[in-house]
Amino acid sequence: MLKIGEFIYPWGSGHYSRMMRLNAIMGDYIKEKFEVHFSSKDHVYHKLLEKFPDHKDQIHQILMPTPIDGKFGPSILLSLINLLLPVSKNPPLVKQVTSYLREESKLYDKEKFDLVINDGDMGSNIIAKNRQIPSLFITNQFRPKLYRSRSYFYPALIFVSKQIEKASRILVADSPPPYTMCEYNLNFTKDVKEKVTYVGHFTTSVNIEKKAISDLEKLVENSEFGYWMRTGNRSTNDGTGQRYEQVFHQNEMKNEK
């Protein structure tokens, strides 16, 4: 039996949503019998337990390091302090990384995965590379373009991209060029482009039954409109919501729907 390890980064809900969509259709493409093991922490771990109550032995809690929450998303200052000092019940990041990689390595030793799929989890990506296990890395960013005022982040971005490119194949959750929405977050190097596949937005293909037109549909009918998907962590979503509220209450927006 083919054994697949799926490692889901627990920051926000986007990684979980994408992996569940992929997991739902894998049986259409993998013809031999297979078993999936999931790994994550916090709310994602509990969602997995609720979704797969009969497979709890295949759901593993791995304490993957995540940024420290601020008022409007991750706090850069607190996250930097957390590199060497404990913050908000989080041990120093150096200790977290060591512990989490050790736990993931033990899981690899125990389960003997034939294929690994990582959505946001670079640690597992590195382990798979070192053990010569075929791996997929799902992402919508590689080396994002930054404002000059944020150029000090480039060393970290280069480090992260180096870990992502260790995957056997990189799956971009977006449409291929020239219709790529997240193109400014990618900027793949020439040697990496050969292993990149654009796989779409992981949207559901379930047919929606047509019902009576809702008030929302009436509001946007025959109008140009946009929407925002809020799939980040709670503080990021709250901060984004507050900013949108401020914009929508400005005088320039009075005549807008």
PLM regions and their residue ranges:
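Structural motif
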Residues: 114-115, 169, 225-226
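Short amphipathic alpha-helix
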Residues: 15-27
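Active-site-proximal region of nucleotide-activated glycan assembly enzymes
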Residues: 130-198
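Short internal beta-strands
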Residues: 35-41, 171-174, 257
